[in-house]
């Protein structure tokens, strides 16, 4: 009888944490993009559109001027500080979201969805981390401007180009934040079933990302 109860409890744990992971993609991605969008909306940039995994506006001429280091021309299209703020607003929104999830776990209850969203929202730093690592240890790496012209594109890189703050410093802060909040959230995985909960949550996240990127997102915000 006890074995049946244990199996049932394990199954319930797996189901709860899988279900929590199912909301991770939309709730982990959209606040980040809305952060970008709201700042750009306040700036009044042309042709601004919010998409399910990004924000677009008529930025080609702005960045062409930046690549030429013609900042005076770029500033006539949009204020450099404003574009830098819009690029920083996404990560800042993510930090606020993660802190809100942590606060919810601590003061309300450790709902699996809160834990899943907090972890998923920070997964975006992976690409930036790879670039920052190469920037630190490869002296032959092109400049940030050249790297962006060659296709590198993430928030911290654009902020670095417009403000002069080094990419490794921005990414380093994000990694410290991830390590601190990630370690703190581990306490909310159920004791004795942490592996079951973690694996189920990750599977739910994967399903969430596939569904959001492939179906829900394009339908909601093409």
Regions found by a protein language model. Give the residues of each.
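Small-residue-rich helix-interface/hinge motifs
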Residues: 20-79
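Short, Lys/Arg-rich, polar N-terminal cytosolic tail immediately upstream
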Residues: 1-11
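Alpha-helical hydrophobic membrane-insertion segments
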Residues: 14-18, 104, 175, 179-183, ...
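Metalloprotease/metallohydrolase-associated module, dominated by Zn2+-dependent proteases
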Residues: 64-186, 208
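Hydrophobic alpha-helical segments, chiefly the membrane-spanning helices
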Residues: 18-23, 83, 87
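Juxtamembrane boundary at the C-terminal end of a transmembrane helix
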Residues: 210-222
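Membrane-interfacial entry segments at the cytosolic side of transmembrane helices
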Residues: 111-115, 190-203
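Transmembrane helix-loop junctions in multipass membrane proteins, especially transporters and channels
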Residues: 37, 41-49, 102, 106, ...
């Amino acid at each position: 009888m006890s074995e049946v109860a244990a199996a049932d409890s394990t199954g319930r744990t797996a189901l709860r944490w899988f279900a929590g992971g199912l909301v991770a993609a939309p709730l982990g991605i959209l606040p980040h993009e809305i952060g970008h969008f709201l700042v750009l909306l306040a700036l009044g940039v042309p042709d601004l559109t919010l998409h399910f995994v990004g924000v677009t506006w008529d930025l080609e001429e702005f960045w062409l001027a930046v690549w030429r280091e013609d900042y005076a021309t770029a500033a006539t299209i949009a204020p450099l500080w404003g574009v830098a703020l819009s690029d920083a607003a996404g990560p800042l929104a993510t930090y606020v979201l993660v802190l809100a999830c942590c606060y919810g776990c601590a003061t309300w209850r450790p709902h699996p969805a809160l834990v899943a969203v907090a972890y998923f929202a920070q997964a975006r730093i992976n690409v930036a981390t790879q670039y920052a690592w190469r920037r630190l240890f490869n002296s032959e790496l092109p400049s940030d401007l050249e790297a962006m012209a060659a296709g590198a594109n993430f928030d911290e890189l654009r902020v670095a180009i417009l403000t002069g703050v080094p990419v490794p410093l921005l990414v380093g802060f994000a990694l410290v934040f991830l390590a601190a909040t990630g370690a703190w959230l581990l306490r909310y995985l159920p004791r004795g079933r942490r592996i079951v909960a973690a694996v189920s949550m990750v599977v739910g996240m994967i399903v969430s990302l596939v569904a959001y990127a492939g179906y829900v997102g394009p339908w909601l915000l093409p």
